[in-house]
UniProtKB/Swiss-Prot annotation:
EC number(s) on file: 6.1.1.1
Function field: Catalyzes the attachment of tyrosine to tRNA(Tyr) in a two-step reaction: tyrosine is first activated by ATP to form Tyr-AMP and then transferred to the acceptor end of tRNA(Tyr).
Protein name: Tyrosine--tRNA ligase
Motif 'HIGH' region: where in chain: 42-51
Organism this protein belongs to: Xanthomonas oryzae pv. oryzae (strain KACC10331 / KXO85)
Length: 403
């Protein structure tokens, strides 16, 4: 049986803040399974590793015997969460929201236990609300309080428009906790204002206020900006296993520890400390730790056999030994006259620009099927298929087709 200290250690792993810790301890001590909620607005069809930070924490609550609520914000998704935004979000259509929501349901059970998961839609209660009900809800907060939010304050100070419906978003998210009688709500650090709104509304409606647990925003592949599809620094959980492996193996050594803390369900805190000590002492190469994380992620979102095949493909390119046909084939569209190598590297996503590609060619850092490319003016035409590598970590198996 898990002790209170063990439960708190698992719940607190990677967390930025828990409000209020003493209330969490009291509810855990009661022995009654907690209702743990996290909301996801279906603004895009695919989830990426950044989204799984909250899903992993939900899974840890499930491991401790608690019930989690995966709340799909089909109603709030049409409003658009203003958190962290310096401009009004474009609202989504009902059709877009529902299509995205369907894909979410398919993806989350790669992490969550179906038996301990409620999937809910907040249109269940907001679809029944009258205009009078919404006005009553709006009366629970003031404009002055809303402007305490950093993003709203900045936009107000710089005379950027703030639409009235954006003020409603925190109230609507907060009311979700009332409707679901949540004991705990999880969210990113940028959601703290909205999560605290839930506490206040629950008290107003005579419920015990939920515990708020915030998680950090996961840094993307480059280790600086938060993971985002718009920035291209993400790993989608529906991506092929080879892409999950190769992208994970490209991250920096320091970022590896951060990802382990927020993404791994297999490596305990104690083991992570031990691994870090082994790397520091030189007993273990950082690549081995990264490979273990890559294997775990590829297995979670696919299966063990597929993960091992992906690792074999990655290893074949890195070492120059093995079967590179295990790598996924990426089609690159070229004109009839073909593309010079610099343009091909950029088109294949191996360099951010032709100038960077030219620099890599001058450094003799470009290989074709394991051989250094000596001719920086070489033109590639339809029918070419092979593995192109830039530096140690960037590679792709490409096939050229005429568009």
């Amino acid at each position: 049986m898990t002790t209170l200290d063990e439960s708190l250690a698992l719940i607190g792993r990677g967390a930025e803040e828990i409000l209020k810790l003493d209330q969490l301890e009291a509810r855990l001590t009661s022995g009654v399974p907690l209702r743990v909620k996290a909301g996801f607005d279906p603004t895009a069809p695919d989830l990426h590793l950044g989204h799984t930070v909250l899903l992993n924490k939900m899974r840890q609550f499930q491991q401790l015997g608690h019930q989690v609520i995966f709340l799909i914000g089909d109603f709030t998704g049409m409003i658009g969460d203003p958190s962290g935004k310096n401009a009004t979000r474009k609202p989504l259509s009902r059709e877009d929201v529902l299509a995205n929501a369907r894909t979410y349901e398919e993806q989350v059970f790669k992490i969550l236990d179906r038996e301990r998961t409620e999937v809910r839609f907040n249109s269940e209660w907001f679809g029944q609300m009258s205009a009078a009900d919404m006005i009553k809800l709006s009366a629970q907060h003031t404009v002055a309080r809303m402007l305490e939010r950093d993003d709203f304050a900045k936009r107000f100070g710089s005379q950027q428009p703030i639409a009235i419906h954006e003020f409603l978003y925190p109230l609507v998210q907060g009311y979700d906790s009332v409707a679901l009688r949540a004991d705990v709500e999880l969210g990113g650090t940028d959601q703290k204002f909205n999560l605290l709104m839930g506490r206040g509304l629950q008290e107003h409606y005579g419920q015990a206020p939920q515990i708020v647990l915030t998680m950090p925003l996961l840094e993307g592949l480059e280790g600086v900006a938060k993971m985002s599809k718009s920035l291209g620094n993400y790993i989608g959980i529906n991506e092929p296993a080879i892409d999950i492996v190769t992208k994970t193996m490209k991250i920096g050594d320091e970022l590896t520890w951060r990802w382990i803390d927020l993404l791994s369900l297999d490596i305990s805190v104690a083991e992570a400390v031990r691994l870090k000590e082994q790397v520091t002492s030189g007993e273990l190469h950082p690549r081995e730790v990264k490979l273990r994380l890559a294997r775990e992620l590829a297995t979670r979102f696919h299966d063990a056999a597929t993960a091992e095949q992906a690792i074999a493909g990655w290893h074949a390119v890195v070492t120059g030994q093995g079967d590179t046909s295990l790598l996924p084939l990426q089609e690159v569209v070229v004109p009839a006259e073909g593309l010079r190598i610099a343009s091909l590297l950029t088109a294949a996503g191996l360099t951010p620009s032709n100038s960077e590609a030219t620099r890599k060619l001058k450094e003799r850092a470009v290989k074709i099927d394991g051989e250094v490319l000596e001719d920086a003016t070489r033109v590639f035409t339809q029918g070419f298929e092979g593995v192109i590598q830039v530096g140690k970590r960037n590679f792709a198996r490409v096939s050229l087709v005429i568009g």
